[in-house]
Amino acid sequence: MQVEVCIQSQINQSSKDKLTNLNLYPAGIYPQTWKNWFKTWLEYLQPHIPPAPSYELGVLLTSDEEIQFLNANYRFQNKPTDVLAFATLEVKYPKSEDMLNSMPLSIGDIIISVETAQRQAQKQEHLLLTELAWLATHGLLHLLGWDHHDEYTLQIMFHQQVALLNKVGITIDFDPL
C-alpha cells in the first residue's frame, strides 16, 4: 500500500511566540514519520476502508486563530478546536475502474491546532508528539466515516485511537471517563 501525506505548517509569528521550540515540524515529527504513521494506520484499518492501490491525505498544522476561522466558517462554531477533518470520501463523483486503479484515493484533510495540542498535552501530562498523534488518529477516523454522536460511540472511537497509536509504538494513558 502506498500512502502520500502532504504536511503543511501555517502558524503566524504571534502564535509561534506562544509555542515553545516550535519549528516547521512540531515535536520533531518529520514528514516521513507522519507518512509512516498513516501508512501503518491505513494498513491496520484496510478491511474497513474503500480498496485502492494508494491513498493520499493532507495534514495542516496550524494555530488556534486559523483553526477558529475554519471552525467558524465550516462548522459554525466560532471558537478554536483541537482537530478538524474534511473528508473527501463523502463526496460522490463518477469513478471509472481505470481511474480507481491509476490514481491515489484522496481521503481528505486533517487540520490540527498545535497551540491547543500543546495545552492538551500539558493537561494530560504527556508529550506533544503523543497529543499530535492522538489528534491525527481522531481526524483520520473521521475521514474514514467514524463519528461520535454520543458517549458510547465516542468511547469506541477513543479505543480505536489507542489501538492505532499502539501500532506505531506510542502508548497513552487512556481513562475512558
Feature-to-residue mapping (PLM):
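An acidic/histidine-cluster motif and surrounding catalytic segment
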Residues: 1-133, 144-177
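Conserved ATP-binding N-box helix of the HATPase_c
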Residues: 141
